[in-house]
């Protein structure tokens, strides 16, 4: 055998080894393929968004009894959307446009096709429709998209305010029992869990009151204000320390977001994320007790939840349950329902959703959006829903930071209870989501 013959054998042997390796590698890849999550394609997104940053709901004069120091003036009237709030929302809108264009949901440039983008807002307070409009303007500047909302002279929109208009009946005894169950039997005991935050707030306010003090003390600071339930025609409210602390903590937050000088944020005593964040604890507790118990959440949230499901599941009969005033066209690829923190609290209470945001102390931040993103598996046509909370961090709001794909807002994938089976990359099968929604509806509470 010649040297050339030996070389040929070695080459042939090498080729055979390479071919065998390729066959083994291909077989291994084929064996692994069933374990790989299929690539899902985004085909629709349904938003539930809170309005943007506003001024306090009270005038400085109305707030005066709560502190020894004067409250600062604001450039707009009480409870109005501020220019900072509009700017933050248009920034968010621009980010959503970029993100969803990259995913193929929205056009990268120009205006969307008619009927593919829709927004419907609560009509009770002006800041909500204005917030929805700022979102649309940020997403599609110059396109003239208009927010829909019910005529304000016709009263509250039943979709967002079903208990207030009598569409959904709420039993005061049942609502009171639901709140006390969530508080483990005692509102004051529940409030003690936030005692450190309340004490820090009292050290800022420096005011003592003689009303509603626990243990009938002649006077006390906000950390020792008592809490009581008061029933009315539109439900049950928690009056006392938690409600007062909710107002105060949120007003300090509004000062921080608005960009007030540090000396004017809680009079300089809570002007950093580290000192401000704990003061939002009582507010989160207040909403958890007053709005998220399932009985209360279902009465306040069922019409809106039906509309969300109808928009999300537009290929099924469920879409026929969507209330006519806020019903988006079936062709809509992006639908935004815009309301208040109480609406987010009601829907999350109904669905059993929970989260904690490490860089944002407000559980339901202004401009925060719970997005129900519908995806499809091109291989088998099955649909899934991924719930994502988008929000601006405390520092992004304070500094009005520009957002883009390289500098995104906060993003948290929210897990729905009962979605372990069949979940793909945080997305739950649409039939499972549908059943979860339907099980949470109040049977005696129709659509809006």
Where are these regions (language model features)?
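Sec/Tat signal peptide C-region and signal peptidase I cleavage site
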Residues: 26-32
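Bacterial N-terminal signal peptides that target proteins for export
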Residues: 2-17
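Intrinsically disordered/low-complexity terminal segments and short unstructured peptides
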Residues: 1-2, 25
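Detector for intrinsically disordered, low-structure N-terminal pre-sequences
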Residues: 11, 22-23, 48
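Signature for phosphate-centric chemistry
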Residues: 32-118, 122-335, 339-448
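Residue-level marker of intrinsically disordered, low-complexity segments enriched
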Residues: 4-7, 21-22, 401
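Bacterial N-terminal signal peptides
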Residues: 15-26
